[in-house]
Design a protein with these regions (language model features):
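A short, active-site helix/loop in glycosyltransferases that binds the activated sugar's phosphate group
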Residues: 2-29, 36-38
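Conserved donor-binding/catalytic core segment of Leloir-type glycosyltransferases
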Residues: 10, 50-68, 74-77, 91
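Short, structured helix-loop element that forms part of the nucleotide-activated donor/catalytic region
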Residues: 16-21, 91-113, 126
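Short alpha-helical donor nucleotide-sugar binding micro-motif in glycosyltransferases
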Residues: 121, 129-134
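Aromatic "clamp/platform" in nucleotide-sugar-dependent glycosyltransferases that forms part
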Residues: 142
Length: 236
């Protein structure tokens, strides 16, 4: 099948584009990434992360379901050497849509109560404050077109560790504004986590580049500019 000249197809990033090309390889697909407001310019009450004990906090946010890969993150945390794991804190935020995944997180919290934490829900101001204070966000999704909480981290200059099966992975410059691991492999994720935990100064130094990534791809201004260009090209 072919598209008429008046039909234009857009996707939110390389991961969604690849999925569309798997069934329609001849389609020309433009990139149109959503825009998020600059939450860093807003005022919000501080969210208490004293439970992290001053250690770098690694955060994942999202409903517990197989697609989101919380089990992969759990397994990666378990694979860390004890002396490495205790240098960091880990927070899972999300509603337990899948009981087996919730059980995996609960077991992890029980085994490492001073290191791993779970919150069912945080209010929007709390999420913003969390992103402002955390060291890194982790997205272990098996399939995720463009995870919003990772973008929210970028707004505050926070690097991410993401699966290759995320749209974010296609935009990351490795070691500059984030890290990508492959094959949904907990061992690979554990190795990236270990590096990040042992080099917190590198995470902090990535702040400016992470912020640039937000401004270039995810800001409202970037979205409006891309949409305007696409409309002009379609009607010109």
């Amino acid at each position: 099948k072919t598209l008429g000249s008046n039909v234009h197809v857009c996707a939110v990033g390389s991961h969604a584009t690849a999925a569309m090309h798997s069934v329609r390889p001849d389609f020309s697909i433009e990139q149109l990434i959503y825009g998020l407001p600059d939450y860093a310019q807003e005022s919000f009450p501080p969210y208490d992360i004293s439970y992290a004990g001053g250690r770098p906090l690694f955060v994942t946010v999202g409903s517990f379901e197989p697609r989101k890969g919380q089990d992969i993150f759990c397994n990666a945390i378990r694979l860390l050497k004890p002396e490495v794991r205790q240098k960091a804190a880990f927070l899972f935020v999300g509603k337990a849509a899948d009981k087996s995944l919730k059980n995996a997180v609960d077991a992890l919290v029980e085994d490492y109560p001073d290191t791993v934490f779970y919150r069912k829900r945080l209010e929007r101001p709390e999420i913003k404050s969390l992103m402002d204070q955390c060291a890194c966000v982790v997205c272990a999704s098996r399939d995720d077109p463009m995870p919003t909480f990772v973008t929210e981290g970028l707004i505050f200059g926070k690097p991410s560790i993401v699966s290759e099966h995320t749209g974010t992975a296609g935009l990351i410059t490795e070691g500059v504004d984030g890290f990508v691991y492959k094959d949904d492999d907990p061992d690979q994720l554990a190795k990236v986590l270990e590096h990040a935990i042992l080099h917190p100064e590198q995470l902090a130094a990535m702040k400016a580049d992470c912020r640039k990534m937000y401004e270039k791809y995810y800001s409202n201004e970037a979205y409006v500019a891309t949409l305007t260009r696409l409309v002009n090209e379609s009607t010109g």
